[in-house]
Amino acid sequence: MKHLLRGFFIAVLYICCNFQLVLAQPMQTLPVDKNVRIGKLDNGLTYYIRHNALPEKRVEFHIAQKVGSILEEPQQRGLAHFLEHMAFNGTKNFPGDETGLGIVPWCETKGIKFGTNLNAYTSIDKTVYRISNVPTDNVSVVDSCLLILHDWSSAINLADKEIDKERGVIREEWRSRNSGMQRIMTNALPVMYPDSKYADCMPIGSLDVINNFPYQDIRDYYAKWYRPDLQGIMIVGDINVDEMEAKLKKVFADVKAPVNPAERIYYPVADNQEPQIFIGTDKEIETPSISFFFKSEAFPDSLKNTINYYGIQYMISMGVTMLNSRLAEIRQQANPPFTGASAGYGDFFVAKTKNAFGVDASSKIDGIELAMKTILEETERARRFGFTETEYDRARANYLQRVESAYNEREKMKNDTYVNEYISNFLDNEPMPGIEYEYAMMNQLAPNIPVAAINQVMQQLITDNNQVVLLAGPEKEGVKYPTKEEIAALLKQMKSFDLKPCLLYTSPSP
C-alpha cells in the first residue's frame, strides 16, 4: 500500500492547504471492484454484471438512463414521466393485446409483482426501471426479463389508444401529488433557479400538456433520448456472469447507435451575490420550516475516482455529522428553539451541476424566527470556531466503526446494494473500488486528517454569497413570517453574531 500512502499524503497536504486547490490536482486513479463485469457494446450501451447469491436463486435487472424531465421541450412538460408509464403499456415483445401478454401481466404470472418487484421512477436528470427478485430456476423467465430491458431501451410501442388511456392515469397521479408542499416547490423553483431550465422541471409536468399533447411529441422524446449511449444495464444475482454477458450482447445487438445524436446537456446553475429568498404559504402545510443553502461548485465527475474525492467527502461528512450532533443536543433541551433541525451536503436541491451545504429547521407555528436564528448561529459558530478534538474523535470513531462493519459484512451484501452502487457509477461517476479497498484506504486516510482540516473545509462551504433560502409555512390568519428583507439582513449579520466557541458538546460519550 505504499503507493496509496504516498498519494494520501499528497492529498492531505493539498486538502489542509486549500480545499479548492485539491479539485485541480491530478491524483492516483482508484481501481474498479474486480468482482463486477463492466463492458460497453459497439452501440454505446454500458453494462454491469455481477454474481451474488444473496438472496439465493434470485436476480435483479435494472436499466438506468441519463435522461429525465430536464430534457423536455416546453410542449413536452411531463412527457418523460408519461413515457415511463407507457413503458408498461405495450412493447415489441410484450404487446399487451390479443397477440401476447403485456409486461405487467406476464411478470405477475411469474410471481414478479407490479409496484413491489416491477417498477420505475423518473426524476430531473435520470430515469430508472427495475425488475427485482426474479427467480433464476427457470431460464426462460430470466431470458424474458433481459428482453424486457431490451424493449424498454428501444421498443416501446406508444400506440395512440394506449396513450389516451394513460392520460387519465397521469391526471389522477397529478391531482394526488398536488399537495401544499408540491405547490410551494413548484413556485419556489423560479426563485431558486432564475432564468434556468430548472425553474420549470418537476417530472409531473403540466396538466395542460398531459391532456392535450399530440402523440408525436412523446414519440419524439423517446426517439431523441432513449438511446444506448445514454443507457446502462445492471444485472446482479445468482447467475453465471459469462452466460449472462453473452445473452445480453445477443439481445441488444439489434439496438442501433444513434446517428447525429442530440447533445446531452447538463445545465449549469448560476452563482448569486445577493440571497435568493422564497417565502411560500399554503393551507395544507401544518408546520413552518426554513432551509438555507450555501451553493458551491460540484466536484467534477472526471476527478471523482481519486483519493482527493474520498478525502474531501470524508471531511465534509465529518463536518456535517458534528454539526448535526450539536443540533440534536439543542433539540433535547427543555424548551428547544425548534422542533427539528439538520444539516447536509449534496446536490443543490434538484440540480446535479451545483452542490450545496444546507441547514434547515422546523418549528412550532409561532417559532420560525427563533428557529431560523438558532440554526444560523450554530452554522456561524461552526464556521468561526470549528469543532473540538473531542467532537471529532467521536465522529471519526463512529465513521470508522461503520466502515469496519461494512467490511465485516461484505459477504452478506444483497443484490440491490450492488445495483445501487452501479447505478451511481453509471449516472454520476461515483467510484466503486470495492469495500476491501475502501476499508484499507479509509483506515489510513481518516486517522491522518486533523480536525483543523475539517474546520477549514467548513469555512469554505459556508459562504457569504451563493445563498438560497426557502421558507414554507401554513397559510393561517394571524400567523406572521419574517420578510425577505429581514431574512437577508440576518444572513448579512452572521459574521457579527455575538458567539463563543462551543462548550456544550465536548464531553466524551459515556
Residue ranges and their predicted role:
Residues 90, 131-165, 330, 348-408, ...:
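M16/insulysin-pitrilysin zinc metalloprotease superfamily fold
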Residues 99-105, 157-175, 240, 259-273, ...:
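Acidic/histidine-enriched alpha-helical segments
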Residues 232-288, 397, 401-406, 490-504:
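An aromatic/glycine/proline-enriched structural segment found at the starts
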Residues 60-132, 183, 200-206, 321-354:
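M16/MPP (pitrilysin/insulinase) zinc-metallopeptidase core fold and M16-derived inactive scaffolds
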Residues 30-60:
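Mature N-terminal segment immediately following signal peptide/propeptide cleavage
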Residues 505-510:
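Conserved small/polar residues in nucleotide/adenosyl-binding loops
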Residues 167, 181, 218-250, 466-467:
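Non-catalytic, conformational "gating/processing" segments within enzyme and secreted inhibitor domains
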Residues 1-26:
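Bacterial Sec-dependent N-terminal signal peptides
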